[in-house]
Amino acid sequence: MRKKIIAGNWKMNLTLAEAKEITKGLLSACDSSSYEIMVFPSALHLESVASIARDSQLIVGAQNAYQSGLTAMTGEISPVQLAELGIQTVLVGHSERRQFLGETSEFDNTKISYFLKHGLRVVYCVGETWAEREKGNTFSVLEDQIGKGLKGITSDLFKNLVIAYEPVWAIGTGKVATPVEAEEAHAFIRKEIGKLFVGADLVAENIQILYGGSVKPDNIKELLAKPNIDGGLVGGASQKLDLFLGLLK
């Protein structure tokens, strides 16, 4: 049975004091929650947040890393440096990095492959824009992102892979896919993963697929009631402790 995940992506938000406060407030919730709880702080806050979360059930992940060991790559973070902080989970493919930094699914594939082969857990984000959805291209976009992003990933590596479906038009807009629309996309993603290689149907059945896009305490239960939705990758509602705790009830 797939365990539900609630993951908070803090992006470039929160002061250090705010990040620490939320982290401390989540520790006791982790002990009693049936969910797997993750937070993805700003790179500058990783060390402090990871220190607070050490020896707890709270998983601290990085919003980005580079697909290499220690090397000359200005402005990037190596998984080796993350490991020193006890961080073994990384986001890949978020729509903001695709849209504003020009990252492609092919580029994401190099990250995913490197990270998984070096023992990291990856949360791979996929999703369509509003223009793509209006043209009826949601499924073709998802097929392309899954096919290119996960190309060559072998079955043994999927145990450390999580998918997050984030329709770009619902991120930070207040819009949200209906539970039926979200379930439809999640079911399609699961089907596409099942077509990646011989025997991938079992991998597809076991992989956790999260929904992201204006997830809040008042809509999360209905979303998680759908059979193919295994949790949420949450932005705004994860940046206030009371709302984050509300997601876990």
Curated annotation (Swiss-Prot):
Give a Gene Ontology cellular component term annotated to this protein.
cytosol
Pathway where this protein functions:
Carbohydrate biosynthesis; gluconeogenesis; Carbohydrate degradation; glycolysis; D-glyceraldehyde 3-phosphate from glycerone phosphate: step 1/1
**Record-linked Pfam families:** TIM (PF00121)
What top-tier enzyme class does this entry carry?
isomerase
Main location per the UniProt record: cytoplasm
Residues where substrate binds: N9, W10, K11, G172, S214, G235, G236
Active site as annotated: H94, E166
A single GO BP: glyceraldehyde-3-phosphate biosynthetic process
Q: Give the keywords, sorted.
A: Cytoplasm, Gluconeogenesis, Glycolysis, Isomerase
- Identify the domain of life: Bacteria
Task: Return the similarity comment.
Answer: Belongs to the triosephosphate isomerase family.
Q: Which PANTHER family match?
A: TRIOSEPHOSPHATE ISOMERASE
Function (record text)? Involved in the gluconeogenesis. Catalyzes stereospecifically the conversion of dihydroxyacetone phosphate (DHAP) to D-glyceraldehyde-3-phosphate (G3P).
The UniProt subunit note reads as follows: Homodimer.
Instruction: State the name under which the record lists this protein.
Output: Triosephosphate isomerase
